[in-house]
């Protein structure tokens, strides 16, 4: 098998890539989980705020019964398979204005967010002003002051040089950014059984490598950002952020992600109590 790589949006934005994967015009793509939701709304469960308590929950959500559950949704509803997952850290909050240490500090600030109904609702629940802006335009929007901040993990923050226009980061653990490696179901059906096994195993190996890379390089990127002058703060009141997000966003987005039964099926798959 020969694999050709087309990085940096050469094949269009993520929505276009997902459409091409579904149509069989593109074999594999790595996309942000939020961009899969218009095609498989139950995958939006992964973006519900404070779904995960820690990295153990994140790993359980992307392996074993939980992965099988989500992959089944993707195959039946989306026309693609989830070969594996890439891990890009919590969506920590950065801004250019001031340190954010409590819920009151974020009120009124404008944040770039992806086109995600759940993230939009989450920031509104905290009293911030979320603005959907494409990823390609994020740096310019920050540089020109169109928004005060954004949300992403340390490796991406450093690679995109956001530290040139953002001086404050707050470690808020409300959502973990996952990017599934999706494979066209049409392409998969054309493969021999041996090739299907080979590519499935390769996806699992890539996922394990990505997790190990993230755990090590995320720490290094954090330190490099501190050395570059970025101030990193922890919240004084994350329980209040959690309460605001869960009490407002979960009921509002229940139907959007497939209903309470789907949410509780996923919670059961990662060993959590049902949402009542």
Predicted ranges, named:
Residues 1-57, 65-66, 72-276:
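N-terminal secretory/targeting leader peptides
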């Amino acid at each position: 098998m020969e694999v050709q790589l087309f990085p940096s949006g050469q094949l269009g934005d993520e929505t276009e890539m997902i459409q091409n994967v579904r149509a069989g015009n593109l074999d594999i793509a790595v996309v942000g989980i939020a961009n899969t939701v218009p095609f498989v709304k139950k995958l939006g469960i992964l973006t519900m705020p404070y779904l995960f308590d820690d990295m153990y929950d994140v790993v359980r959500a992307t392996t074993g019964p939980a992965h099988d559950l989500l992959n089944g949704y993707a195959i039946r509803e989306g026309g693609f398979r989830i070969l594996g997952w890439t891990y890009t850290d919590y969506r920590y909050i950065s801004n250019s204005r001031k340190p954010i240490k409590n819920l009151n500090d974020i009120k009124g600030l404008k944040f770039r967010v992806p086109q995600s109904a759940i993230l939009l609702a989450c920031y509104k629940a905290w009293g911030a002003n979320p603005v959907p802006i494409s990823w390609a335009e994020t740096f310019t929007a920050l540089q020109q002051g169109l928004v005060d901040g954004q949300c992403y993990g340390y490796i991406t923050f450093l690679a995109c040089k956001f530290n040139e226009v953002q001086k404050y980061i707050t470690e808020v653990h409300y959502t973990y950014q996952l990017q599934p490696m999706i494979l066209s179901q049409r392409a998969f059906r054309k493969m021999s059984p041996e090739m299907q096994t080979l590519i499935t195993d390769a996806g699992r190996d890539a996922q394990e490598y990505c997790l190990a890379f993230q755990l090590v390089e995320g720490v290094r990127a954090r330190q490099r950002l501190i050395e570059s002058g970025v101030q990193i703060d922890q919240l004084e009141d994350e329980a209040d952020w959690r309460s605001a997000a869960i009490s407002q966003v979960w009921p509002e987005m229940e139907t959007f992600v497939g209903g309470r039964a789907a949410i509780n099926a996923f919670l059961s798959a990662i060993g959590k109590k049902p949402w009542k």
